[in-house]
Amino acid sequence: NISEKNHERCGEVAKALLGKNGYGLMFSLNLYSKDQNLATQCFEINEIYQDLGLPRSQKYKIRVSPAFPIVGDQENITLPIRDYPKVGRIMVDLLKEYPQLCFRFDCSFPPCFLDEIQEDEYPLVERIFYHGNQPVPNIQDWETSDLYLGCADDSPMDIDPQGDCFNCFPFHNLKLGNITDFKQINDLSIKKMHTKFLGHAFSAEPNEPCKSCPHYMVRCSSGCFAYNFA
């Protein structure tokens, strides 16, 4: 927020919305930099839940999204993939500090976020969700399970301010249409990327550090494909 007054107002609005609609509403944070004050952001969100009396036995989720490149004309600040482990280290520390906190990724979960995790912290990863609602399995099970944490079809539909629809927000050049093109919300929700998008996405070679990463093409598809086109 651009001012302390606006920041305070956002907190007031959040409390009012949660008070009316229940704990199911989700805060959303973009991950722009390893130096952003993620700890303060999570502290303030946790305080709101505690002030509203969230039962100790109940968890809450914060939606997080790394700031990806946008393919095409738009430029935006992105979180470099080389910084994913540093940001992941901060997130693991926050999971330890706030036992009710969970993190939710809409689409892929790049496993390099956990490159700096310690073995005694492995159980914490089950409070990280990917593809919307899938809990990340304990790291000890990764080698023996059929696990894919990368880009997936059926991801949530993104709609930009102009009403243009995307299965993958960074690929603005591959929009599915405009909300005015769909007669019903069900028609919009079942529109999928399928092979056209994935064939295009895999056409670009991965960049470093993904190209040399041991996770690549084992359980990860190089984070967000948009990095390979940027």
Identify the residue ranges that each predicted region occupies:
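Short cysteine/histidine-rich metal-coordination sites, predominantly Zn2+-binding motifs
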Residues: 226-230
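C-terminal accessory region of radical SAM enzymes
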Residues: 85-140, 164-220
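Short, acidic, Ser/Thr-enriched surface-loop or helix-capping motifs
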Residues: 159-160
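Short, small/polar residue-rich loop motifs at catalytic or cofactor-binding pockets
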Residues: 149-154
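Residues that scaffold the ATP/ADP-binding catalytic core of kinase and kinase-like folds
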Residues: 223
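Radical SAM/AdoMet-radical enzyme domain recognition
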Residues: 1-86
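Structural recognition of alpha->loop->beta junctions
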Residues: 46-62, 125-136, 140-148
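Residues embedded in well-ordered secondary-structure elements
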Residues: 16, 146-148, 202
